[in-house]
């Protein structure tokens, strides 16, 4: 990573700004202002962008792919725009390389905010299924007369179908 960033500086692609090493990624055709890509923090530490660029270097050496496709949370669009433009500007990939970002929506909690996966603040699938089954089981018991076993069986089938439908009926880019 250090060699990659040092080469960007030597080639005049990256420069120091407020102690950090950055690459300007703005293009004349941009309709909005894009901040530079930070490739090294002022304390010398690497960032996600730096790791992503190093990964692209490695993939170019090993595979020389025709297309790079990154699927991630849609909130990462700016990050990947910065990484892709830096990779092209630094000559890590050819200027016409096909680099695509596909953003998907987030799974949100009851508060409407995305789950915090790093801090473990997510609902486990088994708990979600259990909660759905419980709601459906209660509805069945309210409105139908059948054995507990039959009601439990139906709630599991309907619950799983509802979960699948809810997941697949939304556009991937929606939260």
Predicted segments — roles?
Residues 1-175:
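Alpha-helical recognition segments enriched in aromatics with Gly/Pro capping
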């Amino acid at each position: 990573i250090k060699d990659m960033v040092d080469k960007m500086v030597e080639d005049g692609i990256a420069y120091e700004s407020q102690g950090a090493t950055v690459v300007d990624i703005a293009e004349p055709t941009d309709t909005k202002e894009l901040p530079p890509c930070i490739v090294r923090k002022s304390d010398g530490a690497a960032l996600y962008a730096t790791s992503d660029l190093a990964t692209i270097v490695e993939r170019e050496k090993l595979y020389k792919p025709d297309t790079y496709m990154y699927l991630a949370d849609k909130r990462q669009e700016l990050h990947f725009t910065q990484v892709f433009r830096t990779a092209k500007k630094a000559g890590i990939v050819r200027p016409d390389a096909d680099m695509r970002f596909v953003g998907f929506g987030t799974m949100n909690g009851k508060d409407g905010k995305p789950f915090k996966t790093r801090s473990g603040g997510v609902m486990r699938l088994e708990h979600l299924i259990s909660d759905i089954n419980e709601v459906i089981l209660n509805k069945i018991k309210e409105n139908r007369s059948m054995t507990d076993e039959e009601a439990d069986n139906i709630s599991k089938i309907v619950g799983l179908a509802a979960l699948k439908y809810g997941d697949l009926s939304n556009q991937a880019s929606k939260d």
